[in-house]
Amino acid sequence: MKSENYIRLNEFIKSHDNIKKAVIFIDKNFPKPVVFIFYSMLAFLALKKDKRVFVCAAIPWIDFYLVTKLRNKINRKRPFESIGFEPVLMHTKGKSCPSRHASSSVIITFAVYFISPFFGIITGIISFFVCFSRVLTGVHYISDVIAGMAISVFIGTATFFGILQKK
């Protein structure tokens, strides 16, 4: 998306109060059910003494760690910094790519789906809104979100539906 499109999108959202409130609500609140479902699944596995609890906790943690290291190294400016507009939602500067919200929500979706396809689909739908909201708030470029998602799709596919599926 071109710079002027980010500015227009940002101005449109900020000039429509209900849309702005909805975008902020999604950005602030939709990660919560993803985390709740994930932790509930881990607790369920732990209570059942299911050894899958370890990989279902470790793989998202490893993904989070790798994405954090990569974004620290890249240290890409956020759209509001490089283009020069006030975002819908204020955020710290730098470390925009890859999006950790996008990456985390996608890898959690893989972990949840690995245990329960039903809850995995629900988590996936919620994660879509989490990812989309990061662009709408002006804190990520589309490419930041796609990069975060791609990393987690690769790691999730390779582990949950590759290595672990063969065991």
Protein language model regions, located:
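Transmembrane helix-loop junctions in multipass membrane proteins, especially transporters and channels
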Residues: 47-48, 72-80, 138-143, 164-165
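Membrane-helix interface segments
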Residues: 17-19, 33, 49-52, 116-122, ...
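Transmembrane alpha-helical segments of multi-pass membrane transport proteins and ion-pumping complexes
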Residues: 64-68, 72, 153-160
